[in-house]
Regions:
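Extended beta-strand-rich architecture
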Residues: 104, 110-112, 117, 203, ...
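Residues immediately flanking
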Residues: 93-94, 106, 121, 166, ...
């Protein structure tokens, strides 16, 4: 925690999910999974510090690798417009590291709202990969329907892993798309799901303290989602480690001149249903977020969606 500048008394589910877990997972994605075990089991502070530094470094390497793969993916998609895409996206490169492909598949699925299969080659020259669903189909059902293409597969309805016959990889997208039309779920009209509708005046420390009493938040206890209708985009700023600009900070205002900052990690101006333009009015879905960066408390919003 000290290495990540997290104060133990303020440790929360976001710190675990976005700071600690990625570093532990980096051990299996980029190195030896035993490194994570050694960190959690050692009583030697010096050894723990050395391992923590190593995991932070390979986690940074993992981020760089994923960003590089995503640039390659976006370049390929630029040559293949969305209207030409199949119902299921299959994309890969023998040079891509298998351990990070689940992260890549998740990003592509979030962006294109389709099931995605991403593959690379492992040290045994086997084509392996990860898949993620947008919720329109169970991946287990989809892969079962297309089982003759796989040497192995497994997972659950939203995420999975697979090994493909080398000679069949170039036909996998077509086969999965045919299977998709057999096992896809009936499309349900999307609706805006939120807990509270309000103006921006509700965003204050007093209300945050009340929300905080319901923590820890997670899958079975999600953070309350607030809907702010017809708020104005005052300012858009990119930020990130070493000037990467991989995150967004947007300032919103409402009719009563209340102003609030809102952030979205790993996002850009094209990440939402509507284009982000200063002075544009939008509907904002967000949760409360208290930052304690460098010991300074700042209440802001975490963007769920912009409509």
């Amino acid at each position: 925690l000290a290495k990540m500048k997290i104060e133990q008394k303020y440790l929360n589910e976001d710190d675990v999910g976005f700071m600690i877990a990625p570093r532990l997972n980096a051990a299996s994605r980029m190195d030896n999974p035993m490194k994570a075990y050694e960190l959690l089991s050692t009583d030697d502070e010096i050894k723990a510090g050395t391992i923590a530094d190593h995991l932070s470094k390979i986690n940074d390497d993992r981020k760089t690798m994923v960003a590089s793969i995503m640039r390659e993916v976006n370049s390929k998609f630029g040559k293949s417009p969305l209207r030409e895409m199949k119902e299921v996206i299959v994309i890969g490169n023998p040079e891509w590291r298998v351990g990070v492909l689940g992260l890549v598949a998740g990003k592509i699925s979030d962006e294109h709202k389709k099931p995605v299969f991403v593959w690379g080659k492992d040290e045994n020259d086997l084509i392996k990969g990860s898949c993620r669903s947008d919720g329109s189909v169970s991946l287990v059902e989809l892969m079962t329907e297309t089982s003759e293409f796989f040497l192995e597969f497994g997972g659950h309805e939203f995420a999975g892993g697979f090994t493909v016959h080398n000679e069949k990889i170039h036909f996998l997208e077509e086969a999965l798309s045919v299977s998709y039309n057999k096992v896809k779920r009936d499309k349900i009209e999307s609706e805006i799901i939120y807990d509270v509708k309000s103006d921006l005046s509700i965003v204050n420390i007093k209300n945050w303290r009340e929300i905080e009493k319901m923590a820890p938040f997670g899958l079975a206890n999600p953070k309350p989602i607030f809907l702010f209708e017809s708020v104005n985009i005052e300012n858009i700023k990119k930020f990130g480690k070493n000037g990467s600009g991989e995150h967004l900070e947007i300032t919103f205002s409402d009719a009563s001149k209340n102003k609030v900052k809102a952030i979205s990690f790993f996002s850009n101006n094209e990440s939402f249903e509507v284009p982000l333009v200063v002075d544009k009015k939008v509907n904002l879905l967000a949760t409360f977020d208290l930052s304690r960066f460098r010991g300074k408390e700042e209440l802001r919003l975490r963007i769920v969606d912009i409509l």
